[in-house]
UniProtKB/Swiss-Prot annotation:
InterPro entries: LolA/LolB/LppX (IPR029046), OM_lipoprot_LolB (IPR004565). This is Outer-membrane lipoprotein LolB. Belongs to the LolB family. Gene3D superfamilies: Lipoprotein localisation LolA/LolB/LppX. HAMAP family: LolB. It comes from the Bacteria. Keywords: Cell outer membrane, Chaperone, Lipoprotein, Membrane, Palmitate, Protein transport, Signal, Transport. Its main location: membrane. The keyword Ion transport does not apply.
Length: 199
């Protein structure tokens, strides 16, 4: 994987990472997602919390946490991200060929693909497409996993894909309720923890 230039400051990178890492997670509102038009069997939704810690090579840490809710009908998706006080920080809307991130201040970023949107905002690749699979307890298509471990039901519990070490646990009928993702980049280590609080 090619290295990308780092953003100007760890905090800026962390803030952008917070907004973009969860592009794969989908929501219609800050609380429980509302039904999408034409919703059917492919509808997938989750509500939860996230915590992201970036540790620099000199030991300095930047951390951010908040809430998320998402709704995915298999084609289009909606996402809201909130800060710990419950205020909306960003909304993401996506469909085939388009992903748009709108921040609380009205700033908009758009790209044809959510991975490209994340990389534009971060200056570093993020497996947005992979997260959509991992949150459902599936492996990302097109990228062979390393160190794959499964539970007694055959569900993935540990693996490495696209530069991320992932641990999935506390499965319910929709997927893991706890995801711990780690990535080592030049000069920094990224730790992401997602906890599902509502199906």
């Amino acid at each position: 994987m090619s290295a990308c230039p780092a953003p100007r400051s760890p905090f800026r990178w962390l803030h952008a990472f917070t907004l973009c890492l969860l592009l794969a997670v989908l929501a219609g509102c800050v609380s429980v997602p509302k039904p999408m038009a034409g919703a059917g069997e492919d509808v997938f939704s989750r509500v939860g919390r996230f915590a992201i810690t970036v540790t620099e090579s000199d030991g300095k840490q930047q951390a951010v946490q908040g809430g998320f809710a998402w709704r995915d009908d298999g084609g289009s998706y909606l996402l809201d991200l909130t800060n710990p006080l419950g205020s909306t920080e960003a909304r993401v809307e996506g469909r085939p060929g388009m992903a748009v991130l709108t921040r609380a201040n009205g700033e908009r970023l758009a790209a044809e693909h959510p991975d490209a949107l994340a990389e534009d905002a971060l200056g570093s690749p993020v497996p947005v497409t992979g997260l959509r699979d991992w949150l459902r307890g599936r492996l990302m298509a097109g990228a062979a996993p390393d160190g794959l471990e499964r539970d007694a039901q055959g569900r993935p519990t540990a693996f490495e894909q696209d530069g991320w070490n992932a641990r999935l646990s506390r499965y319910d009928a929709q997927g893991p309720q706890l995801l711990v993702l780690q990535r080592q980049e030049p000069g920094r280590r990224i730790l992401v923890r997602l906890v599902i609080t509502q199906p």
